[in-house]
């Protein structure tokens, strides 16, 4: 939620080389994916996100996806499947919004709220897995449509 408040109220450095820039409020759209893993707590989170977006005047799309079921069907890890579901949904929504607004898809930016701690954790997980030199990297601040300004 911190990223949403920042995007609405102040300039952000997206790590794209453009420095600090404001995001036009009418271009913001929040995606919340409820993975259905935490019962009432997840439902409360979804409700909180939707209420916050309403109070800020930012449209919100909420999806409910049974990630545990997807993971079981695909013999996958729940975290990995959840991540793929979120990023796939974000890309699809970005494409849809670009088409609706008549904007080139290359203009789309998906902001995620990864923090420095998340990036450090990814680096340490790669070290513990025994990654070679190419694997000793953290989450990049920018990759494709994805930007991580925090």
Regions found by a protein language model. Name each.
Residues 1-150:
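Core alpha/beta nucleotide-donor-binding catalytic domains of modification enzymes
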